[in-house]
């Protein structure tokens, strides 16, 4: 398997989904603006997403994929099918209970996660109503993530990577065509989320059948393999929960700030998630099953080379992305969001949060490479301990930054915490002698810094000659923005080429 081609396939699918996601957010911003209704929806949408990351894409994948890879390589197809059946049964049961409980307890959940909303009765009631509609998304997307994890282990990476596009299509369709028929209109977005979850699950099932892993969920509390996953999920849930608890606490802080703060942070987070999703999530998706196979077969040299390859790709693409995100924060927010009810003030507040987030972009992406280094070895406790330390320091930074920087201070805390998390993970990998960097890192980093400086100069020069970004229609603004971005990309890779960088060095292959 060519890892670079697999990464390109997953990244391209993820990029398409993120671009469509930006279109979705731009449409939502234009139709609904940034106020009480959107604050209510984003809280109601964020909570199922947080639980999805805990139960599905987070803890479950960390516990499930390494054991699934072991079954696939050592136990044979029949045993693997039985294993998948029992695991899917337990996951369905657990998530069904969580979903029903969440729908019944929606008002109390809001009281805990966004207590500032309780001061406004209408806002609190609307958020509770929206949460009851969006909660089934947890069950649907968790099952979709289970299917995706299996497909990834069979190297069918592009199929799960495309699935999130269906959620964006659902939300765009409901926002444009269904919102006028709902009262209040924001209810359309909540129903779009649930429909999107159904589409993501149904789309992947035929592909699961093609690889012979489409089985009916069954409950067996005594199956050794399924119980290993459950046992691993304990510390995994704790570790993932720590990072998600940090996001919930940030929402609690933001709920006490000016109206619109939750929305400003959401839109900034969406922009930051573009590079972190396209690269970080794609790398993590490919590396976890690949590292798991190397560990299961005892090939430590291959394991070490995979880690080094992933880290170099991180810095190659994340460093310029972080710098460009900060430089282009203004043009990005204005070009994508400043239309209709989304005012210039909203764009400015979103820009401030985006600049703060960009500080931690490298950390966010590097974590996606370093953490699988532990998960693939079925060591979940080490990342958990690091996550707890990171959570404590994040809240201390929140208290320090929220006064002078308001919502941007909360974003800055998340960014700095991501860098701290990455640093501690790297330290433990070296300390435990799990990973040893390959030769040539100093020269590699020096070349990157020089190329980023060249790119920064080109971007600043392009911004200087561009007209005011709030002028013109969306297509005109986006064309100008694309011209600036392409000029920056060309400058960066041209500088690397002059310095002797070769893309073929990253054409890693593994089995």
Placement of each model-derived feature along the sequence:
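Membrane-embedded alpha-helical bundles of multi-pass transporters/translocases
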Residues: 1-511
């Amino acid at each position: 398997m060519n890892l670079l081609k697999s990464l390109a396939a997953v990244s391209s699918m993820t990029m398409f989904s993120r671009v469509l996601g930006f279109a979705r957010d731009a449409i939502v911003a234009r139709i609904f603006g940034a106020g009480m209704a959107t604050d209510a929806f984003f809280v109601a949408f964020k909570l199922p997403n947080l639980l999805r990351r805990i139960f599905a894409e987070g803890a479950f994948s960390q516990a499930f994929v390494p054991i699934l890879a072991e079954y696939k390589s050592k136990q044979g197809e029949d045993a693997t099918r039985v294993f998948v059946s029992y695991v899917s049964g337990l996951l369905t049961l657990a998530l069904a209970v969580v979903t029903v409980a969440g729908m019944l307890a929606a008002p109390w959940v809001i009281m805990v996660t966004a207590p500032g909303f309780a001061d406004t009765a209408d806002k609190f009631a609307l958020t509770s109503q929206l949460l009851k509609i969006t909660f089934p998304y947890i069950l649907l997307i968790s099952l979709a993530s289970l299917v995706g994890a299996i497909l990834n282990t069979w190297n069918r990476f592009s199929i799960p990577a495309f699935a999130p596009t269906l959620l964006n299509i659902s939300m765009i369709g409901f926002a444009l065509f269904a919102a006028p028929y709902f009262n209040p209109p924001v209810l359309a977005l909540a129903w779009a989320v649930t429909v999107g979850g159904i589409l993501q699950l149904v789309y992947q099932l035929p592909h699961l059948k093609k690889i012979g892993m489409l089985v009916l969920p069954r409950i067996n509390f005594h199956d050794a393999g399924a119980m290993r996953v459950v046992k691993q999920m304990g510390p995994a849930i704790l570790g993932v929960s720590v990072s998600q608890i940090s996001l919930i606490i940030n929402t609690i802080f933001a709920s006490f700030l000016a109206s619109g703060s939750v929305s400003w942070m959401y839109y900034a987070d969406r922009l930051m998630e573009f590079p972190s999703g396209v690269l970080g999530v794609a790398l993590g998706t490919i590396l976890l099953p690949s590292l798991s196979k190397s560990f299961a077969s005892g090939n430590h040299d291959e394991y070490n080379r995979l880690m080094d390859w992933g880290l170099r790709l991180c810095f190659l693409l994340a460093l310029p992305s972080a710098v460009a995100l900060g430089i282009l924060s203004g043009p990005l927010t204005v070009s994508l969001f400043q239309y209709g009810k989304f005012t210039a003030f909203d764009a400015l507040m979103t820009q401030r949060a985006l600049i703060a987030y960009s500080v931690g972009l490298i950390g966010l992406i590097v974590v996606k490479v370093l953490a699988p280094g532990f998960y693939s070895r079925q060591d979940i406790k080490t990342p958990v301990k690091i996550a707890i330390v990171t959570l404590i320091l994040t809240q201390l930074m929140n208290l320090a930054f929220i006064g002078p920087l308001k919502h941007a201070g909360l974003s800055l805390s998340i960014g700095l915490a991501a860098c701290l998390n990455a640093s501690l993970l790297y330290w433990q990998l070296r300390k435990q002698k799990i990973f040893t960097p390959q030769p040539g890192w100093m020269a590699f980093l020096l070349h990157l810094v020089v190329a980023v400086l060249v790119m920064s100069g080109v971007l600043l020069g392009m911004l200087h000659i561009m007209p005011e970004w709030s002028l013109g229609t969306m297509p005109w603004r986006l064309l100008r923005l694309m011209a600036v971005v392409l000029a920056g990309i060309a400058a960066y890779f041209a500088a690397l080429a002059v310095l002797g960088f070769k893309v073929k060095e990253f054409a890693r292959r593994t089995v």
